[in-house]
Amino acid sequence: MTASSPSLSPTLELACELIRRPSVTPLDADCQALMMRRLEAAGFALEPMRIEEVDNFWARRGGDGPVLCFAGHTDVVPTGPLQAWQHQPFDALIDDQGMLCGRGAADMKGSLASMIVAVERFVADHPEHKGAIAFLITSDEEGPAHHGTKAVVERLAARGERLDWCIVGEPSSTSLVGDVVKNGRRGSLGAKLTIRGVQGHVAYPHLAKNPIHLAAPALAELAAEHWDDGNAFFPPTSFQVSNLNSGTGATNVIPGELTALFNFRFSTESTVEGLQKRVEAILDKHGLDWHVEWALSGLPFLTEPGELLDAVAASIRAVTGRETQPSTSGGTSDGRFIATMGTQVVELGPVNATIHQVNERVLASDLELLTEIYYQTLVRLLA
């Protein structure tokens, strides 16, 4: 079954159209143009924002009152080896198991299609709805994420745009659609650590300083450190060394330098400044000649039970009969940028079992459920 099949629902028809556009990050491949045409027909004011090589758009419909924003990305990760795919990654096929197959089916063109169709239905049913509906869409989520949602949020905040609630279409579900929603994410703080020694001959260690030997006790202490206890919403902060490099390649040379890359995934119980100070104190304690370059990817954010989370949970219950489980696990998402506006943020999307894999796929029927969940959430918040 393909995108041209007359038996496809509006959601699946649009999902297939989006998947068939090969929008490997940071390319958009006219996905946003397709979405904007649909939104313009539904009465949205459109504001394309091309920033550097990244396509973004902001769309808004409605007047004063609370604003519910749908956020997501049109870019997808590379396909990997084409010969490993059962179907070509941009053909958008529904197989005999009822799975919509293709790059972006789960992450996150299926969600984008569900959002658009849900909003079209809601606007048709409630043309004089309360508040406003908005869309914030980027083609820079899977890449560096410098000129996408982050940059758009900065522009919106600078002109005083209001964003009360935001649903991000990331694939949050684990086994069944709606079984898990993300109501927050841990912060991500990375670093490049350089330990300087003195290069020399391995036969004359007294004339050298081996940075590997010097760094090992400090790295062991950092790895064993108890950073915090976490809380009811977040697990304890974790520290992981991801790269360790030293040496000239020769077996008879003591290296002069060691570099280590490490990362914190941290809860709201820790701060950036606090983690940095504790790391630097441990390095000083071991008498190291060190230099560290810090890189903050995002602060932790949390949406506690309230209007948005309650509406999403009630909609999932009404559509699927199941109770959703709020979670803050996993990596970072663009929700971290939107949360800086004081916005309640919830991530809700399809099952994430095959994201970024070859043969990415999602149950076609799950996208129908997701469309209805988005629709019911709109009704609860803005009807």
From Swiss-Prot:
Pathway listed: Amino-acid biosynthesis; L-lysine biosynthesis via DAP pathway; LL-2,6-diaminopimelate from (S)-tetrahydrodipicolinate (succinylase route): step 3/3
Cofactor needs: Zn(2+); Co(2+)
GO terms of biological process kind: diaminopimelate biosynthetic process; L-arginine biosynthetic process; lysine biosynthetic process via diaminopimelate
Catalytic reaction equation(s): N-succinyl-(2S,6S)-2,6-diaminopimelate + H2O = (2S,6S)-2,6-diaminopimelate + succinate
Alphabetized Gene3D superfamilies for the sequence: Zn peptidases
Keywords (A to Z) from UniProt: Amino-acid biosynthesis, Cobalt, Diaminopimelate biosynthesis, Hydrolase, Lysine biosynthesis, Metal-binding, Zinc
Positions that bind Zn(2+) 2: D107, E142, H356
Entry annotation: catalytic residues: D75, E141
Recorded family membership: Belongs to the peptidase M20A family. DapE subfamily.
Functional summary from the UniProt entry: Catalyzes the hydrolysis of N-succinyl-L,L-diaminopimelic acid (SDAP), forming succinate and LL-2,6-diaminopimelate (DAP), an intermediate involved in the bacterial biosynthesis of lysine and meso-diaminopimelic acid, an essential component of bacterial cell walls.
Record's subunit section: Homodimer.
Protein name: Succinyl-diaminopimelate desuccinylase
Organism annotation: Pseudomonas aeruginosa (strain LESB58)
